[in-house]
């Protein structure tokens, strides 16, 4: 199998490149604007190119990669934010730059003659705070927009409904046949060797296949994973595994609510 490659947006001090290297993936380039984090990643990943400010990048001019990762600024979505401007905010709204870059990369690959599962990037990863489940108007609208924006990289006309009236759950998935899949779940720092109650969302999309839920929910031994957290991970994986469908997001959501005693 050819070696996978990755591009990292909002790179910070290189968390995604570090994870990539530990899993046999090559980080090819990164986008970051702060000088100190760039110095850190230049030291740790000397072969990784730095491509600059995401708002000034053109995806068609970037080296193609198999995986695109990013943790867009979370301040406007965080419950600690004073205004909670969400995706309408100047910082958290940079999420749409990740969508733009991904689309431009894929469009350029299609022009090169690629199609189907060979179009790059095939995999899309996004990390953010759990506050995105509740930010936006109406309540939780921002996460619906996130899901819809990513799904439209595959199908430009698709619409993702709101999970009215219950709100978003910390784990879930969407699949469009065998040609697109998306999964998200909450990660809790106390199970990953960090003595903090720091909760984050990790979202993975397979833009050309059905592997997103397998990537995100199948348990495997990862660096820093404590045995005490294994049961929690496996419980989440088991609770969502049977919920994936090819046709009905609303059926999946209703099923989850019934399991939780909400309906």
Model-derived regions: residue spans:
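Short SAM/SAH-binding signature in class I
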Residues: 65-71
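Class I S-adenosyl-L-methionine
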Residues: 57-65, 77-263
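Short alpha-helix immediately C-terminal to the canonical SAM-binding loop
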Residues: 36-39
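Conserved SAM-binding strand-loop segment of SAM-dependent methyltransferases
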Residues: 47-53
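Class I SAM-dependent methyltransferase "Motif I" SAM/SAH-binding loop
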Residues: 8-14
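Extreme N-terminal starter segment of soluble prokaryotic enzymes
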Residues: 2-6
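Conserved acidic E/D residue at the C-terminus of a beta-strand in Rossmann-like folds
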Residues: 31-34, 127-128
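A short, Lys/Arg-enriched amphipathic alpha-helix followed by its capping loop at the start of a domain
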Residues: 15, 19-26, 44
């Amino acid at each position: 199998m050819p070696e996978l490659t990755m591009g990292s947006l909002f790179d910070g001090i290189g968390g995604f490149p570090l994870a990539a290297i530990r899993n046999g993936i090559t980080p090819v380039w990164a986008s970051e604007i702060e000088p100190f984090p760039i110095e850190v990643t230049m030291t740790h990943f000397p072969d990784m190119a730095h491509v600059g400010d995401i708002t000034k990048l053109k995806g068609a001019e970037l080296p193609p990669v198999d995986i695109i990762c990013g943790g867009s600024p979370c301040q406007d979505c965080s419950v600690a934010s004073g205004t909670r401007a969400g995706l309408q905010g100047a910082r958290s709204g940079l999420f749409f730059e990740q969508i733009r870059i991904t689309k431009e990369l894929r469009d350029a690959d299609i022009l090169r003659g690629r199609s189907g599962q060979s179009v790059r990037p095939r995999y899309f990863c996004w990390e953010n705070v759990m506050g995105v489940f509740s930010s936006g108007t109406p309540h939780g609208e921002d996460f619906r927009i996130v899901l819809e924006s990513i799904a439209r990289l595959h199908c430009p006309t698709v619409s993702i409904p709101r999970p009215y009236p219950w709100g978003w759950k910390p784990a879930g998935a969407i699949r469009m046949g065998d040609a697109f899949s998306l999964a998200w779940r909450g990660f809790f720092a106390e199970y990953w060797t960090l003595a903090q109650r720091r909760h984050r969302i990790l979202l993975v999309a397979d833009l050309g296949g059905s592997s997103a839920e397998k990537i995100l929910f199948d348990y495997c031994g990862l660096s820093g994973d404590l045995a005490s957290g294994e049961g929690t991970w496996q419980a989440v994986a088991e609770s969502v595994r049977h919920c994936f469908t090819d046709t009905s997001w609303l059926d999946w959501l209703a099923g989850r609510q019934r399991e939780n005693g909400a309906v």
